Amino acid sequence: MNNSTLEGQVAFITGAGSGLGAAFASRLAQDGAFVVVNDLDPQAAQHTASVVEGIASPFDVTDSSAFDAAISDVFDRFGRLDILINNAGIAPNGSAASFDKAIANQMLRMETRISEMQPLDYLTSLSDQDWDRMIRVHLYGTFYGCRAVLRVMQQQRFGTIVNISSILGQSPSAGAAHYSTAKAGIIAFTKSVADETAHLGIRVNAVCPGYIDTPLLTPFSELMMAAIVTRIGIGRLGTVGEIAELVRFLVGPESSYCTGSVFTASGGYNA
């Protein structure tokens, strides 16, 4: 049954060319929202926009001027902006090898009862550029999006924002200091913004997905994926549809009493 409780609402979703973002776009469109699809890849943005009968707005979320212009264009065109989902992100690709090294060391430790793991060199070899890019895409991108949208929502005195963090923002992992730091920052930022905007009728929440079956997991080896699944209580990766249902709940009237909250969906990974 098609629930039309989002009928007439306008949603802006970053990183929606594939994976979680595309699932969010489809789910909100299913319930009547008009979706503006952002992605760094113009073709990916246009593909999702075509599927959900929305419009594409391709740009790099680390470009604050581009973000401001995009939100201004949406408001000028529709006269409102109801929903922002800050989803754009990049995987800790550069640390996939050190993730595997950490797992290998843990296995060695269990097998030989070694009391100390060998030191990891991922942090000392992490470049300024890799650190900066990770922080800028996740944390700066979320800030730029919220700042631009809140200028509109402040005038409207309504709106909902969902910032996508990660379980690694709650429980940091070896080999992902830059990713964990960025995602933890999103959690703190979300709580602060929610406190500032609640009196305006604006709700701001964060979602911390666990390991979800998306292209972001492509860099991980079979060894890494096997180790991850063994730690998930449910015994499998999550699906984009499961996270999309949670996000749909948070942008709708069903969650009208929720703001400043962090919702974890990890299958029991960090229980």
Predicted features and spans:
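Active-site helix of classical SDR
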Residues: 146, 182, 190
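C-terminal substrate-recognition "lid" of short-chain dehydrogenase/reductases
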Residues: 158, 236-270
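Short, small/polar-rich loop/turn modules that mediate ligand/substrate recognition or access, typified
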Residues: 198, 203, 233, 258-260
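Alpha-helical segment proximal to the catalytic Tyr-Lys
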Residues: 151, 195-196, 256
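Residue(s) in the substrate-gating loop at a strand-loop-helix junction
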Residues: 166
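Canonical Rossmann dinucleotide-binding motif of NAD(H)/NADP(H)-dependent dehydrogenases/reductases
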Residues: 4-36, 193
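Catalytic Tyr-X3-Lys loop
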Residues: 90, 101-143, 158, 162, ...
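The beta1-alpha1 cofactor-binding region of Rossmann-like NAD(H)/NADP(H)-dependent oxidoreductases
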Residues: 42-43, 58-71, 90, 128, ...
